[in-house]
C-alpha cells in the first residue's frame, strides 16, 4: 500500500487563506492524498508575536479555528493533522489534532514546550 502525504503552507490573511484552501482541496483530490499535514494553528494570523496576552485576539483565533473545522471535510477522505488554539478550563493550549471523516476531530497532543523569545511569545499567551 502506498501512502500519499500532502504537506502545505497556508497564508493567514483571510482572503489569501480562501485561495490557498481552494488550491489545497483541488490538489488533495487530484493526487488522492491519504494524509494532509497543515501548518501549526493555520486558520488565524499568528498571534504570539506580541508578548502581551490579548483575550480578544485569543478568542478570535479560537473562533476562526472552530469555524474552519467544518471545512476539513473538504479534504476527505484524507486524514488531516494540524494544531489549534483551544481552551481547557482556565488554561490555553496549542493542541495537536487528528481529523478524519469517520471519527471527526480528536485531540492528539497538548504542546508543552512553549518558547518565549522575540517573535514567538507562546508561553506568555
Predicted segments — roles?
Residues 87-125:
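Active-site catalytic loop in hydrolytic enzyme cores
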Amino acid at each position: 500500500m502506498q501512502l500519499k502525504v500532502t504537506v502545505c503552507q497556508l497564508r493567514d490573511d483571510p482572503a489569501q487563506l480562501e485561495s490557498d484552501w481552494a488550491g489545497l482541496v483541488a490538489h488533495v483530490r487530484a493526487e488522492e492524498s491519504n494524509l494532509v499535514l497543515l501548518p501549526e494553528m493555520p486558520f488565524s494570523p499568528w498571534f504570539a508575536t506580541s508578548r502581551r496576552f490579548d483575550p480578544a485576539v485569543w478568542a478570535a483565533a479560537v473562533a476562526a479555528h472552530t469555524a474552519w473545522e467544518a471545512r476539513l471535510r473538504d479534504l476527505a477522505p484524507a486524514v488531516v493533522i494540524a494544531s489549534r488554539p483551544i481552551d481547557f478550563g482556565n488554561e490555553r493550549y496549542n493542541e495537536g489534532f487528528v481529523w478524519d471523516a469517520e471519527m471527526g476531530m480528536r485531540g492528539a497532543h497538548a504542546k508543552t514546550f512553549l518558547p518565549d523569545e522575540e517573535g514567538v511569545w507562546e508561553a506568555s499567551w
